[in-house]
Every structure is written in C-alpha cells, then in structure tokens.
C-alpha cells in the first residue's frame, strides 16, 4: 500500500507490466486510482490482451482460454518462466493471476490519459497510458 505518501507526492509514476497482476477489475481500478492520486503525470504499460501470444506464458491464445484449460496447460507443459506446475491448486492460482486488458479497458481506468500502442509487425504488443 502507498497510503504513507500524500496526494501528489511524486513528479511522475512509472508502472511497467504490473497492472495486469493486481486483480481485475477491482485491483486494477485501485491501482489506477493510486497512480492518479500520487501524480498528475504517469506512464502505465501493460501487455495487450488482443496480441496473439500471451507474453507471460509465451503460448498463443492462452489469455482467451477458460481457467480450467489454463490450469491444465500449466500442469502439463513447461510454459515460459513458470515451468510445469505439479500442484493443481497452484496451477489454478497461477492461471487466475494475470488479467490482460485491451486499450479500451486501460483508457477506462485512466480516462484523462493518452493511450499509446507499442507495435511489432503491425500488431499491438502492449498499450501505454501516458499523462
């Protein structure tokens, strides 16, 4: 928690690939509110939900699967940084952890920001709210 800091305590707030890990929608809304409270200038980047390869697991379309399918894949395949997860409960927890968002979702959280797009081969890889 950043409660110990007064409103406007920072010249700028920088967040790179964090907001998708804090729990959607409530956690993401709370984080966006904290960013906006701490500074009028900020940079909030997150991977784009609509990019074909999920960046945390390096698996095509992983973000579109139901939790049970994500957990199954996590238990049976060594995906990116997590490897293979033997424990079913841990696999389900990890499957729920990342909640990617699209540009409209990010803009809804910080409506006064400009939403930029980082592209690779013409596809939007990540989205960035800048103010």
Regions found by a protein language model. Give the residues of each.
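Conserved class I S-adenosyl-L-methionine
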Residues: 34, 41-73
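A general structural signal for short secondary-structure junctions and capping/turn motifs
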Residues: 35, 107, 118-119
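Short, glycine-/aromatic-enriched active-site segment of Class I SAM-dependent methyltransferases
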Residues: 60, 79-93
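Short hydrophobic/aromatic beta-strand or adjacent loop that forms the aromatic wall/cage
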Residues: 98, 122-128
């Amino acid at each position: 928690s950043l409660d110990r800091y007064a409103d406007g305590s920072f010249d700028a707030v920088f967040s790179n690939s964090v907001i998708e890990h804090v729990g959607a929608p409530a956690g993401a809304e709370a984080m966006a509110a904290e960013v906006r409270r701490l500074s009028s200038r900020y940079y909030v980047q997150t991977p784009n939900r609509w990019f074909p390869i999920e960046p945390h697991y390096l698996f095509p379309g992983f973000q579109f699967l139901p939790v049970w399918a994500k957990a199954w894949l996590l238990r049976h395949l060594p995906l990116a940084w997590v490897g293979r997860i033997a424990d079913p409960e841990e696999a389900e927890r990890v499957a729920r952890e990342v909640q990617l968002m699209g540009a409209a979702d990010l803009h809804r959280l910080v409506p006064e920001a400009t939403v930029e797009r980082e592209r690779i081969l013409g596809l939007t890889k990540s989205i960035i709210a800048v103010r």
